[in-house]
Each structure stands twice: as structure tokens, then as C-alpha cells.
Amino acid sequence: MRAIADTGLIVAFGNRTDCFHPWAVDIAKSITEPLLTCEAVLAEAAFHLRSVPYVLSLIEDGMLRIAFEMAKHQQRLAQLAQRYQDRHPDLADLCLIRLSEIFPHHTVITVDEENFRIYRRNNRETIPILCPPRSPARH
């Protein structure tokens, strides 16, 4: 599966008490190539997990690959921020929308189904997403 990793997947994978941990482990077992992501997602995940070394180890171990240079996409990120200002997207979400535009054959793996069902790549295209089955509220 060619995919892009959002923060929630990384946090769930790294936190055994997260309600989505089993789902995240199943995803990790099924991947055959590194999941693409961006620095904004990694910063969020490191914050939530309280472990920069752990998040960096996912890159070193080949589970994740940084595939985005924000400086090259500032104009598009600003357009996306303006378009979705009513949803108050964080920088990571904007970067993932842009990653989905750059890598159109990749699926975004996220626990944020509500927002990613609304976000569009290339202004009109639905972003393919993979979310956990609907389950209890996150811890």
C-alpha cells in the first residue's frame, strides 16, 4: 500500500493505551514501503508521545519517510489555509493535503476522518483516506 501517515496513526502506534493502537499495529504490519509524511506531523507526534527519539526511530527504521519540503510549497499551503479557515486546520493537515496532491496514488492514513472527508486535493478531488473503524472516543 502506498500511503501518507497523519499524526494520529503515529501516536496510536507508539502508545499502547491509545484506543486505536491495535488498528495502527495492523497497519504497520501491512506496509511494504515507508509511509510518507512531513515534519509538521512528526513534530505533533513527538509532542503527543513526549518522545522525539521514538519518532526519529520510525524514520531510521524505515517505517516513515519525510517527503515534503514546506518552503517549496508555501504559496499552496497559504491557499489551503485560506480555503479551510472555517475549519481551523493545523499546519500538519495542510501539508498532508499538499502531499496528497503531489502523490495522487497514495492514501492518507488518519484518525481524523471528520476533516479529511471535507478536505479536497486540487480543489475538488476527494482525498483517499484509510481510517480506523468507528470506535469509542480517543483517550
Regions found by a protein language model. Name each.
Residues 20-24, 41, 51-55, 73-77, ...:
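Amphipathic alpha-helical interface surfaces
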Residues 1-37, 48-57, 122-123, 130-138:
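Short, well-structured N-terminal submotif of metal-dependent ribonuclease cores
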Residues 104-139:
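Acidic, PIN/NYN-like endoribonuclease modules and their adjacent C-terminal/linker elements
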Residues 30-35, 63-65, 102-107:
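Short active-site oxyanion
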Residues 54-72:
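Helix-adjacent hinge/juxtasegments
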Residues 67-113:
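Active-site neighborhoods of divalent-metal-dependent phosphate/nucleic-acid chemistry enzymes
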